[in-house]
Design a protein with these regions (language model features):
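Cytosolic-side membrane-insertion boundary helix
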Residues: 227-256
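Membrane-inserting effector segments that mediate pore formation, membrane fusion
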Residues: 247-277
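Switch II of P-loop NTPase G domains
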Residues: 75-81, 91-139
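Short glycine-/polar-rich loops that comprise or flank the Walker A/P-loop
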Residues: 116-120, 143-147, 190-194
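Conserved beta-strand segments of the P-loop GTPase G domain that flank and frequently precede/overlap
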Residues: 121-126, 149-152, 197-198
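Conserved G1/Walker A P-loop phosphate-binding module
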Residues: 1-96, 101
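AAA+ P-loop NTPase catalytic core and its hallmark functional loops
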Residues: 71, 81, 91-108, 149, ...
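Canonical P-loop GTPase G-domain recognition
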Residues: 153-226
């Protein structure tokens, strides 16, 4: 049962017992719980893979922004670095050092970065997947965490393909890249690998919307809404989902305010209304 369904059930039970004060308290607790739900997203990959740019894009931040993860030639990430979402600070995207830069084998790498705190992993590559990527995926599988492969810089890959192919077909090229990645992962024992082709500078193109939907589906319901609100507005379906989440929260705010207003406690309604501003 989702947090929302549980809250509604408890509120209805309180109202059936004519306990409006308990109902209001349940609603307020639910809203507080929503605000405190953390979401920790781990992004890792080899040097030059576009990992830090992906961290910024996922947060809706330009690389030139003061809050952006540093990007550039060479490995700039030497230890896990937290980048909170600019609007939803409980959502944190972690820029992790590439496994090849830590001198730790894959199983020790996960312990080194504190894998337990992450809700899921995104492994970023810019061209072919590296041996370290495969090893890391295998270790994450053993730990029971969800992970997703992102082939970043796909726009650059397509441009190179267009210049080198006599009969260039974008869809066929994308499909070939995707199939090659999946085949390589399967050959190394990764079960049902999920590969997404992404441009860090044009998230609305290629597979980023599908990546979003896949992560949403895999997350528990109480974290799913947190993710939806934090994702960049790259298409109309994103905006629609955000409206639905906000609409759901608004009904709890409205109920809390209306219920508190009915309680014979001087000043309590005003305090509740102020809390909604």
């Amino acid at each position: 049962m989702s947090l929302e369904s549980k809250a509604i059930e408890d509120i209805n039970r309180a109202l059936e017992n004519d306990d409006t004060q308990a109902a209001a308290s349940i609603s307020q607790t639910y809203l507080r719980d929503l605000d405190s739900i953390p979401l920790n997203i781990a992004v890792t990959g080899e040097s030059g893979s576009g990992k830090s740019s992906f961290v910024n894009a996922f947060r809706g931040i330009d690389n030139r922004d003061d809050r952006a993860a540093p990007t550039g030639v060479g490995e700039t990430t030497m230890k896990p670095k937290a980048y909170p979402h600019p609007i939803y600070p409980k959502v944190t995207v972690w820029d992790l050092p590439g496994i090849g830069t830590t001198k730790f084998p894959a199983h020790q790498y996960l312990k080194h970065i504190g894998f337990e705190k992450f809700d899921f992993f995104i492994i970023v590559s810019s061209d072919r997947l590296r041996e370290n990527d495969f090893k890391l995926a295998q270790e994450i599988m053993k730990m029971g965490k969800n992970f997703y492969f992102v082939r970043a810089k796909i726009d650059s890959n397509l441009l190179s393909a267009e210049k080198s192919q006599k009969e260039y077909d974008e869809e066929k090229t994308l499909q070939k890249i995707r199939e090659n990645c999946i085949q390589g992962l399967e050959e190394r024992g990764v079960t049902a690998p999920q590969v997404f082709l992404v441009s860090n500078f044009d998230l609305h193109l290629y597979d980023f919307p599908t990546l979003q939907e896949t992560i949403e589906r895999d997350l528990p319901s109480h974290k799913r809404d947190t993710l939806i609100l934090a994702l960049p507005n790259i298409c109309s379906s994103n905006i629609k989902k955000k409206k639905e989440v906000l609409r759901s929260q608004i009904k709890f705010h409205a109920f809390t305010s209306a219920t508190v207003a009915a309680l014979p406690i001087p000043g309590l309604s005003i305090a509740a209304d102020l809390g909604l501003q």
